[in-house]
Amino acid sequence: MSQALGAYRNGLRAARVAFKGDLRMLMAARQQMRESMVNPPNPELPPDQQIKLMNDVAQFLRQNVVQGKRTKDDKYHLNIHKDTELGDNETIKTTKKTLAAQGGGCCGGGAGLYK
């Protein structure tokens, strides 16, 4: 039971970091976590896997959710914090053969583009 409580608290702390300054989203995330603890979405999972799922959600919130706020000049200020995962985008630069248009794309003009 203490592991479940620890995972729940971990989720609440992660939501506080991810949704800092956005009270509406913070309250919605807290309500969703509370509901998921009382009525698990996958009740057939063993408790240890449900605890792992809650910890994974907390990790995802900390590392991958970034709040943005529109500024006066139609730009966005992102709330990037110390736990935000910043990738180097190297995987984006490499083209995957499965995603390349084999037949030349929808209009036929891309034949030989990704070779």
UniProtKB/Swiss-Prot annotation:
It comes from the Eukaryota. GO terms for biological process: mitochondrial respiratory chain complex III assembly. Coiled coil: none annotated. It is found in: Mitochondrion matrix. Keywords: Chaperone, Mitochondrion, Transit peptide. Transmembrane segments: none annotated. GO terms for cellular component: mitochondrial matrix. Residues 1-35 form a transit peptide. InterPro entries: Complex1_LYR_LYRM7, MZM1/LYRM7. One of its GO terms (molecular function) is protein folding chaperone. Belongs to the complex I LYR family. MZM1 subfamily. Assembly factor required for Rieske Fe-S protein RIP1 incorporation into the cytochrome b-c1 (CIII) complex. Functions as a chaperone, binding to this subunit within the mitochondrial matrix and stabilizing it prior to its translocation and insertion into the late CIII dimeric intermediate within the mitochondrial inner membrane. Modulates the mitochondrial matrix zinc pool. Interacts with RIP1. This is Mitochondrial zinc maintenance protein 1, mitochondrial. It comes from Kluyveromyces lactis (strain ATCC 8585 / CBS 2359 / DSM 70799 / NBRC 1267 / NRRL Y-1140 / WM37) (Yeast). The lineage of its organism: Eukaryota, Fungi, Dikarya, Ascomycota, Saccharomycotina.
